[in-house]
């Protein structure tokens, strides 16, 4: 029985590759910011549902390995839509500051 999984994975990989190529081929910081601003509304769906992004969980694992959540202060530089901060908060970290160059990404993070 063919569930079409391989076809879906190829399509998703193609989308992921296309976005990465756009990011790598930007000519200026402003162009890169515009790209992330345009992507912000669908970023979480792309990285979580489509690509299976595990960065937040890996970050939580390693921070727990080296830090105690009580009293720890975390700076999430390049926080995007706040995916890491949400996961860290669920893992007991309470003092998390996020910064990002994209105002649209920060607006998405503020919703969380």
Features from the language model and the residues they span:
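N-terminal, positively charged/glycine-rich alpha-helical extensions of SAM-dependent methyltransferases
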Residues: 2-42
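Residue-level signal for short amphipathic helical patches enriched in basic/charged
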Residues: 50, 69, 91
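Class I SAM-dependent methyltransferase Rossmann-like catalytic core
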Residues: 41-53
């Amino acid at each position: 029985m063919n569930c079409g999984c391989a076809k879906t994975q190829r399509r998703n990989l193609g989308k992921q590759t296309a976005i990465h190529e756009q990011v790598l081929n930007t000519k200026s910081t402003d162009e890169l910011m515009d790209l992330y601003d345009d992507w912000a509304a669908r970023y979480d769906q792309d990285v979580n549902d489509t690509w299976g992004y595990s960065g937040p969980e890996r970050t939580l694992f390693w921070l727990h390995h080296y830090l105690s959540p009580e009293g720890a202060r975390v700076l999430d530089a390049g926080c995007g839509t706040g995916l890491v901060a949400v996961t860290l908060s669920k893992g007991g970290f309470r003092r998390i500051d996020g910064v990002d160059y994209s105002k649209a990404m920060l607006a998405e993070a503020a919703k969380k």
